[in-house]
């Protein structure tokens, strides 16, 4: 039998790359990890119109609240957090190619999985979602 095609090299995708991790037992962990890693990568180079989204994302990632100039604990409804994550991620990807490498994707928490499935269905321009072996992420099992 023929050998399987090798996965595309991670560096074959241009733009910003972040390595993210999943922990099933922690709600929103993948989203929080992604936000934190992206903020580490872009530094304080945050657009003023992103600050509102980052303020909401502060409910799951304290670094986002700090970037938005918010002090203290932030609370937000889960739907607001999911929408802010989707809008911020797609906005970043529209401005520069963005590759999110997902490690332990099978261990993703349910909230993040729902958001990931939304992103996979919408396929926003500039956003590439990759598994830990560097392959592009297709439909993931729902874990149900």
Whereabouts are the PLM-identified features?
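Key residue(s) within conserved catalytic/signature motifs
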Residues: 1-144
